[in-house]
Design a protein with these regions (language model features):
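Conserved SAM-binding loop of SAM-dependent methyltransferases across substrates and taxa
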Residues: 1-10
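A short alpha/beta connector and helix-capping loop motif
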Residues: 62, 74-105
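Rossmann-like AdoMet/SAM-dependent catalytic core
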Residues: 96-159
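Short, surface-exposed basic-aromatic patches at helix termini and helix-loop junctions that form
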Residues: 6-7, 31-34, 55, 80-84
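S-adenosyl-L-methionine
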Residues: 16-73
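Proline-centered flexible-loop/turn and helix-kink motifs
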Residues: 9, 35, 85, 111-114
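Residues at the starts of beta-strands that form the adenosine-phosphate
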Residues: 12, 38, 88
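Hydrophobic/aromatic beta-strand patches that form the interior of the parallel beta-sheet core
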Residues: 14-16, 42, 90, 116
Length: 159
């Protein structure tokens, strides 16, 4: 969230995390980067939170960046929240937890958006080739691998 705010100085950012300790660190990071006025941090998130944000920003350019461990099927459902169809979306897909979720999310957006699937690199071992810092292999793996049972995919849906 803080990185988005730094890179998009006119954007208002709404950030949610279930981990309150992570939110404390994120707030500190926002202060250190002078973006705390534009990043609103919240611990609870559900379809009502999303509806509220989208209703207040109806008509403005809105980008949803979402990683919600399988809840994307419900949160991005246009039947639950039609306003999502007015947004650009980047969402991590969690077929490893909910098989078939990718096809459902594609179905939500393919008529109104240009949809693209981004596939995780083939094998977590490739992460070591991206280690630009002097960090041991086990520490680098700890920082970059979520220990998922399969490659992860992201869906990008642009209007």
């Amino acid at each position: 969230a803080v990185g988005f705010a730094v890179e998009n100085p006119k954007a208002e950012i709404f950030a949610f995390d279930v981990n309150e300790k992570a939110l404390i660190v994120a707030r500190q990071l926002a202060q250190k980067n002078d973006v705390e006025e534009r990043v609103k941090f919240h611990v609870n998130f559900d379809e009502h939170s999303l509806k509220g944000i989208l209703s207040r920003h109806n008509g403005s350019r809105t980008f949803i960046f979402m990683d919600v461990e399988g809840a994307e099927e419900h949160l991005l459902n246009p039947t639950v929240n039609p306003a999502v169809l007015n947004c650009d979306v980047l969402v991590e897909l969690h077929d490893c937890f909910k098989p078939g979720i990718t096809e459902k999310i594609i179905d939500y957006f393919h008529r109104s958006h240009k949809v693209e699937i981004i596939v995780d690199y083939d094998g977590r071992q490739k992460a070591s080739s991206l280690n630009y810092f002097d960090i041991s292999e086990p520490d680098w793996r700890f920082c970059t691998d979520e220990s998922r049972p399969a490659k992860m995919r992201w869906l990008r849906a642009l209007r």
